[in-house]
Regions:
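Short amphipathic alpha-helix that is part of the acyltransferase structural core
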Residues: 2-98, 104, 112-115, 122
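Beta-strand-rich binding-surface signature
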Residues: 118-120, 158
Length: 166
């Protein structure tokens, strides 16, 4: 093989970098074409795999999953108290471009006549996979979530965003 042909030949993949290191940048659809919808159980677990890279800390992936499942089953969150959302396409099983959780709580709201019991939502675990960051997807997702919170279905008196970003 000539030196020119050798120089033009594909380089073997570096096992430390893997295929993703040489893959072209991901194609990101126009954010206005994406929808916010509840994730299926399989999609929820896929989002846990994705965000565990940033959030598991010293936990193994198995321990991270166990913690998330325990949180979901806790008395405060079971029976629909937590919802897992994804910014994605219409179809189930499509790419999840960003994800977020909502935690529904009954709260006391003081009024001039006393107290009312209302629904409120905590917004937590806002996450965009690294390959999609910097494209406004989290902002799009939060706008769409805000629109849902304003619906009669949500019946949301107010919401609060939880963040551990330092």
């Amino acid at each position: 093989m000539s030196q020119t042909a050798a120089a033009d030949a594909p380089k073997p993949l570096d096992p430390q970098l893997g295929g993703a290191a040489i893959a072209p940048p991901p194609t990101i659809p126009d954010p206005s074409t994406l929808i916010l919808r509840l994730l299926t159980p399989a999609e929820k677990e896929a989002s846990w795999i994705t965000n565990s890279v940033s959030w598991a800390g010293r936990l193994t992936q198995t321990d991270y999953f166990a913690r998330e499942a325990a949180n979901e089953a806790s008395r405060l969150l079971r029976n629909g108290g937590i919802r897992f959302w994804g910014l994605t396409t219409e179809k189930e099983g499509g790419e999840i471009y960003a994800a977020v959780e909502t935690l529904k709580k009954r709260v006391l709201v003081q009024t001039s006549k006393g107290f009312d019991v209302e629904d409120a939502y905590g917004i937590a675990s806002v996450y965009t996979p690294a390959k999609y960051r910097g494209n406004g997807l989290a902002g799009t997702m939060m706008r769409k979530l805000g629109e849902w919170l304003d619906t009669e279905e949500a019946n949301c008196r107010f919401s609060v965003l939880f963040s551990d970003v330092k």
